[in-house]
UniProtKB/Swiss-Prot annotation:
Keywords: Cell projection, Glycoprotein, Membrane, Nucleus, Repeat, Signal, Transmembrane, Transmembrane helix. One of its GO terms (biological process) is ERAD pathway. GO terms for cellular component: cilium; endoplasmic reticulum membrane; nuclear speck. This is Protein sel-1 homolog 2. Glycans are attached at residues 34, 162. It comes from Rattus norvegicus. It is a single-pass type I membrane protein. Sel1-like repeats lie at residues 107-142, 143-178, 179-214, 215-250, 297-333, 334-370, 371-406, 407-442, 443-478, 551-586, 588-623. Belongs to the sel-1 family. The keyword Nucleus applies. Residues 19-662 are extracellular. The chain crosses the membrane at residues 663-683. Residues 684-688 are cytoplasmic.
Amino acid sequence: MNPLALLVEILIIIEVTTKNSEAERYNRKQKEVNVTTQVSVSKVKQFLSHLLEQGKANKIANKRENPLEKKKHQHKLKIKGIQNKNLLKRNQNYFKKPAKKSITDKGDELFKMGNKILQESKSQKQKTEAYTFFTRAADMGNLKAMEKMADALLFGSFGMQNITAAIQLYESLAKEGSYKAQNALGFLSSYGIGMEYDQAKALIYYTFGSAGGSMMSQMILGYRYLSGINVLQNCEVALNHYKKVADYIADKLEKSEGIPVEKVRLTERPENLSSNSEILDWDIYQYYKFLAERGDVQIQVSLGQLHLIGRKGLDQDYSKALYYFLKAAKAGSANAMAFIGKMYLEGNAAAPQNNATAFKYFSMAASKGNAIGLHGLGLLYFHGKGVPVNYGEALKYFQKAAEKGWPNAQFHLGFMYYSGSGVWKDYKLAFKYFYLASQSGQPLAIYYLAEMYATGTGVLRSCRTAVEPYKGVCELGHWAEKFLTAYFAYKDGDVDSSLIQYALLAEMGYEVAQSNSAFILESKKAKILGKEKMYPMALLLWNRAAIQGNAFARVKIGDYHYYGYGTKKDYETAATHYSIAADKHHSAQAMFNLAYMYEHGLGIAQDIHLARRLYDMAAQTSPDAHIPVFFALMKLETMHFLQDILFFNFTTKWKWLKLDSTIGPYWDLLVIGLIVVVLIFLLRNHHR
């Protein structure tokens, strides 16, 4: 970015923030004094040395664990290494003076070794080994390794969260021009975690971070400009930020498909997280293995797929994937044959890249009419892998696979018409196939749809229509892996580590992370924020999630205004949010709450008939609402009946008894008492 343009952008940001005087006054009230003890660089180095020392014992005690347990306890693993008594003295001034060339080269080498391990494997054991190299490289003054270690301290990797130490490292790194550190400081400022709550400062940090090349900062700014968070809402600016990240993600996806990450909602089943469908329970996994060994072909293929891409909480394991696919292929599974072809086409440790073997298995699958096999043959002819480039053959196989509904084939058909590869360019056909593939979530199809809308290629240009799919592609970045580590941290009771990971993802615009962060804050179990901040921050996050279409979050906003959590009691505003959730999202809970407010005239005019109707609608919408609705209607009809009897001989002028206000608050106790009396009566008759 041009320095002058950057300066102008910062001045605009400062101007916008000064105009929002009310917001600034609120921010000043929300600021808290940073009482955390400042950690010297030497103490940070001592902490890194401690990490380095702790892993040595773990390297010796290499106990066998199941993949799900390793994944679950990944944040408790310790880093391997050795102890050096002169560590602190030698390195405490590495920020002040440049390290010797030999030390710098060694630090770079160690960082590259660690980074290679980190990128090439999803195994937690190997990730732990990577951090051994990062620790040693950081000790030698390698800035990139220090960034890795600062992240580990911030997010609580290996069970050693120390936000104060992380901030100290980030501040030193930011002075050295680290865009990752600037992004982290912006994030911490935006929540007031370990630092003053300062949205204006956060925005400046993000601006510098994005100028330096931080994809996270780009994404955060894109979300802020899209939603108008502390900046003037501007779709074009949001589009510009999101496109940069989407281009980066699309380039990665063209080289490999990427790994989808399960985004577990803590709000759906908080009392029984282990049974969440997004994560495979260990007992169920063992049962599936048993069935696979007994010859269940469908289970063999399913386990092969899970291990191939590392889904449902399982580590990516190419050897196990190939093992199950070979067993299923031997039994005649066309899907298994196609996946084996895919493994050999892409190449990995278990199946080295081999076009001839890939062609063999794709052909076997295609002969059975398998869509994945047909698409695989199309890829070989399109790219000329093991066979001469032949766009005609590629088109034929892509069409056959697309007719069977395979989204990757639909995308490649669209791409051929979009780029004019072997066919005349036809943007209408390209749009058609991109759209079909996007309905199944094909990420590159979504990206090219966004490209067409952003540039007006073959369609009418629309910023809003383009920015949403760009945002969806951006959310496929490697940073989404924090969803799993945050989930397992929460499940294991490490609430602070879980919250800070969800909070970062929430800042980047992930709706699920916004809901999960608000849910954790609402529980008041976290210690990294003051209790007085939790409800206001939770309300802010519920609101952001609701704007993105979360019905549960919309009901929560109504609840906060109804009870006065993090804001003043406001029945009228509560009723407004319940109405939105009921009308737009058909939420049974919102219908029930709104019915209660109509029944009692809270924030809206009393309307008994509308209350009855909403109670009935709640029962029809959700079976879970039947019993609450039954009791609510029983109470409503009882009160109405008693009022009719007692007021029968009185004119309106002499209505002195207000049963609803007198008995209303205790109606649930009265109903329970009535039920108890009826049960006693029935039991007595039964014994007679």
